[in-house]
């Protein structure tokens, strides 16, 4: 999977987390236990994708350096 696809997946996860936050906020309430668990899982997955993106970008930078030397 390329970085564009990874970014798209990460953004989708964050949009889903934001929607859950907005629903709780609009309802004038805290998260339910299920919502909290879901948001925590979404954030973990988004952080994992961010790390994958950073590794992929680092690999691309290394490859570019090899080609320029």
Predicted regions and their residues:
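Intrinsically disordered, low-complexity terminal tails
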Residues: 1-69
């Amino acid at each position: 999977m390329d970085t564009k696809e990874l970014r798209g997946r990460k953004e989708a996860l964050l949009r889903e987390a934001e929607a859950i936050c907005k629903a709780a906020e609009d309802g004038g309430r805290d998260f339910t236990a299920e919502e909290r668990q879901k948001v925590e899982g979404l954030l973990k997955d988004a952080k994992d994708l961010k790390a994958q993106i950073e590794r992929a970008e680092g690999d691309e930078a290394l490859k570019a350096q090899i080609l320029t030397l």
